[in-house]
Every structure is written in C-alpha cells, then in structure tokens.
Amino acid sequence: MPLSKNVIEKISIETIRVLKSRFDTISDEDIKIRNMPFHMAFLRAFYGKIGINDDTEALKFLTLSQWFHGLSTTLGQSYFENIAHILSNGEKRTFKNYKIKRSVRDKISEIINDLKSGERLPNVEKENKELREATSKNSEYVNGLEFTADVYFEDKDKVVMIELKTVRPNAGEMRGEKQKILYGKAYMMETKPNKKVYYFIGFPYDPTENPENPCGYDKDRFMSSLIEFSKYFDKREVLIAEELWSFLSGEENTMKKILDIINSIAKPDFKEKFDFINTFPFINQDRLYTKDAIDEQKFKKYMDILQEWRLYSEIECAKAVKELSLLKLSSRDRRTFERLINNSMFSNNNKYNENRKMKILELYNKYMQK
C-alpha cells in the first residue's frame, strides 16, 4: 500500500523547507575559497587517501565540508525527526519531574553495571521482564531520570518510543542512552501497565552499506562499527535505515519513497523553481475578474512544478485561484482574495503558509456552492 498523498505532500513540504533554509544560510561569502593554511598543511598528507589532486581541489573540499557539516546538523536536529512524526503520526515528548519506585531504580542500576562489566549481555526480553517485576514490588518512590523520546506514539495496546541518533554517535554515550531507555520503559510500564512498551534506538541510514544500495543495511556490521554499542544494546531494540522508516510508516520501501521525493525536488534548478511557485506568478493582477486574469503559459509551468514536487493540495489551491480570478466576487471577498493571492507559500522564515491555501479553498467552496 503506497503512502497517502497527504503524507507525501508533508514530506515534500519539509524537504522544501530544509532546502530553502540551507540556501538562506549560505551566502556568496560562505562559498568563496578561503585561506586555511593550517588545514591545508595537514590535509596534504591525505591527498592520495581521499583522491584529491592539488591544493585548488583541497580548498574546495574544505569549503564544501563546512557547508556539509551545517546540512548534517539540520538533518539530524530537525528533518529526520519531523519526517518520523509525519510517517507515524507521533510527536516528540519529554518526561521530567516524575517518580519511580526505588526497586526500579536499583534494578536499572544493576542492569547497567552488569552490562558495563560484561557480566551480562544485552537481552531486551529479559530486561523488560526484570523491569516489570521491579515495578510490581512494594517500594518507596524516588525521582526518575528525565528523558525525551524523539518519537512517541501510542495505540490501544502499545506505547512506542524511539531515540533517533546520528549514524556516528559519540563514543561513550551508549551507556547513558541505555540508562535513559530503561528509565523510559520502566515509567511507561508502571503508568500504562496494560500496554506493551517499546523503546527503540533508531538510525536513519547505514553508513557501512554500499552507496549503490542506499536503503540497505547490515545491523550486525553497523553495530560492531560503533564503540561499545553491542555491549549495551540488543539488536532487537535497534532500527536502522529501511527498517526504521518502514516501521514508522507501516509501509514497505518507505526509505526509497522518501529519497524519491527528495530527489524530485533537490535539483540544481531548485531555487529558480521555488522563487517561481512561492507566489502566484500566473495572475495578471491588473486584469483580475476578467477573461485575461490568467497567464495560461505561466499557469501550466506553475502546475508542472507542483506536480513534480508532489504538492497535491497546492494544485487544488492553484485551480481555485484560477477560477476565483475569473468570477464576480463581492467587494468584501475581493479584498480577502486579493490579500491572500499576495501571500507567499513559504514565509521569510521558511514556514509553510497553510492558512493561505485553506482560506482560498474556503472562499472557492463558498462560490461553487452558489
């Protein structure tokens, strides 16, 4: 079953937002070749290793690396998380100032210490059983460890939480991540005792996979590439690459579909197309409400871009604008319509202007019902 048009459009909008924000943060000054003598001095030792031929290529490499770092930060801090929420109908949720039983806290400390010392191997089923038993004991309550689930969603019979990580997490942070996950599961087990509780750690792609197979993954290989990861985590509590994205959506091949959406938008002419569709360029505003209100050639170009970028509801909005531009509107509705068509699809801070679309469609439906 394919992703719904609504989900696809939301992914497209999020992709456009990220691309536009990256264009906004890279000035002509940022892409100039800069003087970096110390970086260059060290980098020359690696020319053969990374396939750089000369200093000119090296300076371009350093400049691109700085920009790429910013893109990686944007993807890790917002894009992956927002796409996960779109696919799962979930949200980010923080838990603090809560209480757990002392017996639970002691059990978590025991599990963590045993994993650290190597006295036990990670086993998610055994750990869950021990946590359930600890929550059922008669024990005083103590403060729990604050935690945030990057993705949280809840069904009738289960609670699912996911910690989204970069594919190269910092060495030494695995112990803390495991501890946080155990606290999160224990708290949910006590507050929602009749529901199954899952807390995964998720990675958006597998960097150890062959680039010719971007959606593929080898969980064992990936886990072994991270310092102390297998020491604390059972592979059953890890979601990676296609496995993660399809789990979130409930549909197969979701990662490929996400990449297809990105690839349809992220092209060299992105900025040119964005600037064209961000307003309604096909309207001849000095000829509104006449047969010459629409520039048909520009309208076709506008619609082609919306179709290519999978902005399905904006296609309906554009059709409504075309119809309304030819109608005899009341003076009050004219004022509303004229203000709406001078709004942008994306604001200066790159926020999608859904209100513009909704108000235009509302006005259109009002006249179509007459």
Swiss-Prot record:
InterPro entries linked to this entry: Restrct_endonuc_II_TdeIII (IPR019045)
Source domain of life: Archaea
Enzyme Commission designation: 3.1.21.4
GO molecular function: DNA binding; type II site-specific deoxyribonuclease activity
Gene Ontology process terms (BP): DNA restriction-modification system
Keywords: DNA-binding, Endonuclease, Hydrolase, Nuclease, Restriction system
Keyword field contains Chloroplast: no
Keyword DNA-binding: yes
Catalysed transformations (reactions): Endonucleolytic cleavage of DNA to give specific double-stranded fragments with terminal 5'-phosphates
Pfam families xref list: RE_TdeIII (PF09520)
Role description: A P subtype restriction enzyme that recognizes the double-stranded sequence 5'-GGNCC-3'; the cleavage site is unknown.
Family: Belongs to the TdeIII type II restriction endonuclease family.
Protein name per its UniProtKB record: Type II restriction enzyme MjaII
Species, as recorded: Methanocaldococcus jannaschii (strain ATCC 43067 / DSM 2661 / JAL-1 / JCM 10045 / NBRC 100440)
